[in-house]
Amino acid sequence: MSDRQAALDMALKQIEKQFGKGSIMKLGEQAERKVSTVSSGSLALDVALGVGGYPRGRIIEIYGPESSGKTTVSLHAIAEVQRQGGQAAFIDAEHAMDPVYAQKLGVNIDELLLSQPDTGEQGLEIAEALVRSGAVDIIVIDSVAALVPKAEIEGDMGDSHVGLQARLMSQALRKLSGAINKSKTIAIFINQIREKVGVMFGNPETTPGGRALKFYSTVRLEVRRAEQLKQGNDIVGNKTKVKVVKNKVAPPFRVAEVDIMYGEGISREGEILDMASELDIVQKSGAWYSYNEERLGQGRENSKQFLKENTDLREEIAFFIREHHGISEDSGAEGMEDPNLLD
């Protein structure tokens, strides 16, 4: 046995010398290690994700119908990474990035790396180069459906290109997944929804780009509008449901309900008020909301406005919500500058 053990030790040393420390290890060595995360920018979504945010070094897919809030959810994640001193990149394949809206959500547009590629191959190669640099903490690709293969762009309008985009995504993800894990980059792929023709039973909806992204994603989020939010006769936003359809780091199928206000993004006050009411941190009596016997306001909108004006009180309530769910603030802030600190 000792000869076999010595041979194994020598082989392990050779592997580590050739491929670097940590390239092979015993499974139990990392059993105690927590998943390093970065907040999604939404407290309700952090709780639904189960680990306090998006796991670093993993692939996330965010999909849903048009104008459901997919890009808004992604921009909040970028703003959170930048707030913690990290570097962010946005691959705008749809050529629809609105810098004014991004700025309102808290994104530092002077520091955000932006690329608007001509072809799908170009967009994915740029993403790979940024990930392999090890200096980017989050990269958002908007969207998979807009990553059109070069052959399709150069071909005629009626030409058939069956499975071309699926093959492109499959090859790209095979190359990207290892680099994403090593660099601790959060890679968010935004995707659209398509209808499968002739489906009689089950869900006819599917996402473009083949099956590869479904397999490689650690987390898949489905974003859908639930109802409109009105102030008088004016529509001021949407109540949006974000369902965690797949989760490899915590139990899946949890749902986060958030208010996405037009021109403002996710309402922090709205989600804090709803979650605190559920946990009885904030008491609701009739139409009145109160906290520690102090009245916040009559009706939800007035209470939201009160919390918006009193940020110290808002963050105090948020602290108790985090404490209840066992989530620490800025859980991924440490090591944001240097991914090697997490190795």
Swiss-Prot record:
Residue sites binding ATP per the record: 64-71
Q: Which residues form a coiled coil?
A: none
Q: Which GO terms describe its molecular function?
A: ATP binding; ATP hydrolysis activity; ATP-dependent DNA damage sensor activity; damaged DNA binding; single-stranded DNA binding
Transmembrane as a keyword?
no
Q: Which domain of life is it from?
A: Bacteria
Question: Pfam families annotated for this entry?
Answer: RecA, RecA_C
Location(s), subcellular: Cytoplasm
Q: Does the keyword Cell cycle apply?
A: no
| Residues annotated as signal peptide | none
InterPro entries on file: AAA+_ATPase, DNA_recomb/repair_RecA, DNA_recomb/repair_RecA_CS, P-loop_NTPase, RecA-like_C, RecA-like_N, RecA_ATP-bd, RecA_C_sf
| Keyword tags | ATP-binding, Cytoplasm, DNA damage, DNA recombination, DNA repair, DNA-binding, Nucleotide-binding, SOS response
What's a BP term from Gene Ontology annotated to this protein? DNA repair
Q: What is its main location?
A: cytoplasm
Q: Which GO terms describe its cellular component?
A: cytosol
Q: Which PROSITE patterns match?
A: RECA_1, RECA_2, RECA_3
Task: Enumerate the Gene3D superfamilies for this protein.
Answer: P-loop containing nucleotide triphosphate hydrolases (3.40.50.300)
Summarizing the function annotation, the protein's role is:
Can catalyze the hydrolysis of ATP in the presence of single-stranded DNA, the ATP-dependent uptake of single-stranded DNA by duplex DNA, and the ATP-dependent hybridization of homologous single-stranded DNAs. It interacts with LexA causing its activation and leading to its autocatalytic cleavage.
What family, per the record? Answer: Belongs to the RecA family.
The name on file for this protein is: Protein RecA
- What organism is listed for this UniProt entry? Bacillus anthracis
Q: Which gene encodes it?
A: recA
